[in-house]
């Protein structure tokens, strides 16, 4: 409603409305760095080492900041891929930022000075490393101008610029003035920050902060990614550890990358090198997919394929009512070529050569069917011809098993501590059987899976202690990994020349 008397027709330009994103049931958590230095009062916002829900690009700018420097601020790549995607946006996502611009943390010791020229009471300069809370503007004589009284500070995320505007019409900031501010120092961030931990005083950080997601927001993490960091063996192994029984209950699937440069600064820029690196560094977890190389879009943005894979896994899940029955393989991605590093000579490879990667448990991206697509539906544990647990052959198999166990726990956790009557036992069986039949009907499972309450698995001692168990054996539907048709030549068709008699 108007807060002043109006008479006539008026028009007002309001706040930006973010491009809508499809709301998926899949819950990915990204761990990395965000430009929270661009968020005012970041120290009180609870945006460091905590899961933050992001629903749009504008939402990200408000909560964690945004920068086009994805190398420094790795979480911005995920934000862009989910909420500025030419193929369609999808979310929400959760991010855990480990960058802490506080004094003594990830902040440069020496302050930065910047000469400003004010025109019409306004000045603007580019910086995404500035800690906005530390900005001061010196007077030409002595002392500093006062923010909120003499001037206001804003940030343009589209241009990456700081905007300073005078607040007093009769005493505007003018001419040449000097600004002083602190900047973030991302060189201080290490694998250990991403891995994180839990202190004796109950402080969570890095991957360990995923454990805060359910008790604080009642969301169940089922995908974990750390683009820009997951190529580190230490981080990858920590991701595999974290993804098992989060909060003692939830299972998640890891999506990671292989590096373009190894720990000795040697390029990993060929298929042969990538396969060798994967084996040497044991990137073989059955609860994970690994990708190599990276990819570039038409604006020269360089994406980790793990990020694009999470986007397409969410999109595929959404198309099946959040049931992870379809791989992200052969799904279009908004890129124009593969990327092997700034100085790499590799021009890329096709789908046929890409088979060398996929048969060694490395997913990739190729040009196929007139577009660029993700390629590969195996877990990292797969190697063609090797002895692999059948459940670990395809990513959909592992994710379906996780989906069933996670869903069982979410469905029946409200019944814990209720009387375990015969009626409740039967209700659990009937409901779970109904879901299994539904999975078969939609094509997520094959055969006739049955949930069983076995006497052999529910001893008198177990029942006496209130411990009950149900057993389910399922066959997740495999993807159509290959389709072959065999065509043979025959001379039988020549008989048409002799049909119908003489002419």
Predicted features and spans:
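Extended, compositionally biased non-globular segments
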Residues: 401-457
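A general secondary-structure signal for short beta-strands and their flanking turns/coil
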Residues: 47, 174, 465-469
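Generic recognition of long tandem-repeat/solenoid scaffolds
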Residues: 117-127, 158-169, 367, 372-385, ...
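Extended beta-strand solenoid/passenger and fiber regions
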Residues: 89-157, 184-185
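Surface-exposed interaction regions enriched in Ser/Thr/Asp/Glu
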Residues: 139-193
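Short, surface-exposed secondary-structure junctions/capping segments
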Residues: 71-77, 164-165, 499-503
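Compositionally biased, low-complexity/repeat regions
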Residues: 180-199, 445-503
């Amino acid at each position: 409603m108007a807060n002043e008397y109006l008479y006539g027709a008026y028009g007002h330009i309001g706040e930006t409305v973010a491009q809508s994103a499809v709301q998926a049931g899949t819950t990915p958590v990204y761990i990395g760095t965000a430009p929270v230095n661009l968020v005012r009062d970041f120290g009180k916002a609870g945006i460091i080492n905590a899961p933050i829900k992001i629903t749009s690009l504008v939402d990200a700018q408000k909560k964690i900041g945004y920068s086009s420097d994805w190398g420094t601020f790795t979480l911005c790549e995920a934000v862009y891929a989910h909420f500025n995607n030419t193929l369609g946006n999808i979310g929400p996502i959760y991010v855990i930022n480990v960058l802490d611009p506080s004094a003594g943390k990830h902040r440069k010791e020496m302050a930065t000075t910047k000469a400003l020229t004010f025109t019409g009471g306004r000045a603007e300069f580019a910086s995404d490393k500035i800690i906005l809370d530390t900005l001061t503007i010196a007077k030409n004589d002595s002392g500093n101008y006062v923010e909120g009284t003499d001037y206001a500070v804003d940030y343009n995320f589209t241009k990456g610029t700081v905007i300073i505007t005078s607040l007093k019409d009769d005493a505007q900031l003018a001419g040449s003035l000097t600004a002083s501010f602190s900047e973030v120092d991302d060189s201080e961030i290490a694998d250990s920050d991403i891995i994180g931990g839990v202190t004796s005083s109950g402080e969570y950080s890095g991957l360990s902060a995923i454990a805060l997601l359910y008790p604080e927001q009642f969301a169940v993490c089922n995908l974990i990614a750390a683009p820009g960091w997951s190529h580190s063996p230490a981080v990858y192994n920590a991701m595999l550890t974290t993804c098992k029984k989060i909060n003692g209950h939830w299972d998640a699937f890891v999506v990671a990358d292989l590096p373009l440069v190894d720990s000795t600064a040697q390029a990993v820029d060929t298929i042969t090198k990538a396969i060798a690196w994967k084996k040497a560094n044991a990137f073989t977890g059955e609860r994970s997919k690994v990708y190599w190389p990276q990819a570039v879009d038409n604006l020269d943005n360089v994406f980790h394929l793990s990020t694009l894979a999470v986007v397409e896994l969410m999109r595929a899940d959404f198309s099946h009512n959040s049931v992870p029955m379809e791989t992200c393989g052969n799904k279009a991605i908004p890129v124009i070529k593969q990327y092997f590093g700034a100085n790499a000579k590799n021009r890329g490879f096709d789908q046929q050569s890409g088979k060398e990667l996929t048969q060694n448990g490395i997913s990739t991206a190729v040009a196929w069917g007139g577009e660029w697509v993700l390629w590969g539906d195996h877990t990292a544990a797969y190697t063609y011809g090797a002895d692999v647990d059948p459940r670990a052959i395809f990513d959909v198999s592992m994710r379906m098993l996780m989906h069933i166990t996670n869903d069982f726990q979410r469905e029946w956790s409200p019944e814990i501590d209720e009387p375990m009557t015969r009626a409740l036992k039967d209700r659990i069986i009937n409901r779970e059987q109904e879901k299994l039949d539904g999975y078969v009907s939609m094509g997520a499972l094959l055969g006739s899976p049955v949930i069983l309450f076995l006497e052999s698995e529910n001893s008198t001692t177990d029942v006496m202690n209130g411990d009950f168990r149900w057993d389910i054996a399922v066959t997740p539907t495999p993807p159509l990994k290959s389709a072959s048709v065999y065509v043979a030549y025959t001379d039988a068709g020549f008989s048409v020349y002799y049909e119908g008699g003489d002419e």
